[in-house]
A protein has these predicted regions:
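Active-site/acyl-donor-binding loops of N-acyltransferases
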Residues: 33, 37-39, 66, 109-160, ...
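Secondary-structure boundary elements
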Residues: 55-56, 104-109
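Conserved acetyl-CoA-binding loop-helix of GNAT-fold acetyltransferases
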Residues: 83-105, 219-231
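Catalytic micro-motifs at enzyme active sites that drive phosphoryl/nucleotidyl and oxygen chemistry
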Residues: 38, 66-72, 97-100
Length: 289
């Protein structure tokens, strides 16, 4: 009989994730960075692997991470849910719901997860029926494009970026731990801190593209500027934007190479938090689990 168990996430679970998803999720080094180098999850209570097992065989996996988040001057704790995978041989219709119930915590103001258009609606139904009726879906689109113009900028240091004012940016504190963590990301060979006036951005460069990892203000102006800066660093730029900016950003691109819909679902346990959450929210690469 299959049961739910809790274990610390380890390298041993990399092959399990590959099997459950049927594809590589960034490589073993990425899993190591994502879960084992995470500076805010050093204790078992802060990051928990929830597994569905039949004797010694793993049939499903879910990861719950406890994070201190902030947006503008609002501080609160969240339960970030990710790496959900269920083996195709599992026929029970309740396992998905039970994973979310197993991950529920009483010490957070919100549950957060990311997924595509189809799955996010299923997850929201589970949230509203079993966790909280106070939910919100924030739709984004991840674009890979060729910028059509160069924008002026200057290189700066992570220390200066930490002093910048990050507006409507949901995630962990932009302190030295956060920037040291992003610099260890295995997919980028160089991390650049850039600014122009009061605009700041963090860009990661790989052989494939320059990716916008963090931005001080998720406005059209700031996105357009950061994308133009990426043009100096690579012919291709990858960026996640709110879907409301889709047409205007695509109009400024020489070519849109790829796009992928991503949604952030938040289930609130505090009315104060949900009421103060701005309509235009952005989440940096570090905090997208």
């Amino acid at each position: 009989m299959a049961v739910f168990v809790r274990e610390a996430v380890s390298h041993n679970h990399f092959k399990l994730l590959q099997e459950l998803y049927g594809r590589d999720l960034g490589g073993e080094r990425f899993l190591h960075w994502k879960h084992l180098l995470d500076p805010h999850c050093g204790a078992p209570m802060e990051k928990t692997g929830i597994f569905y097992k039949d004797q010694e065989r793993y049939l499903g996996m879910f990861v719950s991470s406890f994070y201190p988040f902030k947006i503008n001057k609002l501080y609160f704790n969240v339960n970030m849910l990710g790496d959900l995978g269920i083996h195709r041989q599992v026929k029970s219709s309740t396992v998905l719901k039970d994973f979310f119930l197993q991950a529920k915590r009483s010490d957070v103001a919100a549950d957060i997860c990311f997924s595509d258009d189809r799955k996010i609606r299923v997850y929201e139904k589970i949230f509203r029926k079993y966790l909280t009726t106070n939910t919100q879906i924030y739709p984004f689109v991840e674009l890979t494009l060729k910028p059509d113009k160069f924008m002026a900028f200057r290189f700066t240091e992570g220390g200066q970026a930490r002093q910048a004012s990050f507006i409507n940016n949901l995630g962990r504190e932009k302190d030295h731990r956060a920037f040291e963590y992003i610099e260890k990301h295995p997919l980028y060979h160089k991390i650049h801190y850039i600014n122009k006036g009061n605009l700041y951005a963090v860009i990661g460069c790989s052989s494939e593209c320059a990716e916008l990892l963090d931005i001080s203000n998720p406005s059209r102006e700031c996105f357009s500027w950061a994308i133009g800066v990426c043009r100096h660093l690579h012919s291709r730029c990858k960026v996640m934007i709110p879907t409301g900016f889709y047409k205007s950003i695509c109009a400024q691109a020489a070519e849109v190479i790829a796009e992928k819909r991503i949604n952030m679902l938040i289930g609130y346990y505090s009315e104060k938090i949900s009421e103060l959450m701005p309509k235009e929210v952005w989440v940096c690469r570090m905090d997208r689990r």
